[in-house]
């Protein structure tokens, strides 16, 4: 009987390690994908007269991740993406702005995802808008210029439009990503 219990423990341990390995490799893959998206996006010039407007393609990873990973795993992916992209392609200020936008966006999307009645597109829109709010808040503090708040309406419209696009694409790819990764949808 003791031998059987020991075998069951070892079996659970092996399944647990396999699960951890699968989650770590999935997280690493998502970080790499987000980095690629960020880099490609940096090559696309968007000049609409207001600095800071981007498509936010890397947010595909964050939005989709909220539906297939645990909140902590998504948070780690967001932080790693911001830091790695910032160190490789940006500078200290870009890291600061991206951290503010990324963390606020993550928290808002996580909260809204947990509230019944918000679709993936709605969650994504809120993420796009809150990302811009976070960045403007940091810019106002760093530059000690409250007049930057006047950029906010345009950035909120841009965040809404890009949020819709990212949300629609995320909704379309979620079934394939969930199935391909062998992930179960997390409602956390």
State where each predicted segment sits.
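Hydrophobic transmembrane alpha-helices
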Residues: 3-4, 9-64
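Interfacial aromatic-anchored transmembrane helix boundaries in multi-pass membrane proteins
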Residues: 38-55, 78-110, 120, 142-147, ...
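Hydrophobic alpha-helical transmembrane segments
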Residues: 24-29, 60, 64, 71, ...
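Short helix-perturbing small/polar motifs within transmembrane alpha-helices
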Residues: 4, 14, 27-31, 36, ...
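Generic transmembrane alpha-helix motif of multi-pass integral membrane proteins
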Residues: 57-71, 108-113
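Transmembrane alpha-helical segments of multi-pass membrane transport proteins and ion-pumping complexes
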Residues: 31-39, 86, 102, 106-110, ...
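Membrane-embedded alpha-helical hairpins and interfacial helices in multi-pass inner-membrane proteins
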Residues: 51, 91, 95-96, 114-188
């Amino acid at each position: 009987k003791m031998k059987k219990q020991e075998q069951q423990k070892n079996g659970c341990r092996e399944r647990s390690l396999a699960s951890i390995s699968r989650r770590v490799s999935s997280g690493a893959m998502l970080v790499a994908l987000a980095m690629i998206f960020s880099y490609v996006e940096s090559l696309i010039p968007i000049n609409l007269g207001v600095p800071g407007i981007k498509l936010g393609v890397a947010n595909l990873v964050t939005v989709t991740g909220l539906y297939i990973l645990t909140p902590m795993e998504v948070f780690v992916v967001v932080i790693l993406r911001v830091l790695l992209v910032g160190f490789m392609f940006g500078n200290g200020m870009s890291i600061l702005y991206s951290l503010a936008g990324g963390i606020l966006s993550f928290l808002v999307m996580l909260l809204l995802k947990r509230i019944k009645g918000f679709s993936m597109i709605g969650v994504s829109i809120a993420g796009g808008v809150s990302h811009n709010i976070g960045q403007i808040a940091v810019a106002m503090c760093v530059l000690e210029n409250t007049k930057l708040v006047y950029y906010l309406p345009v950035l909120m419209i841009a965040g809404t439009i890009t949020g819709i696009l990212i949300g629609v694409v995320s909704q379309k790819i979620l079934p394939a990503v969930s199935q391909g990764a062998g992930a179960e949808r997390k409602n956390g």
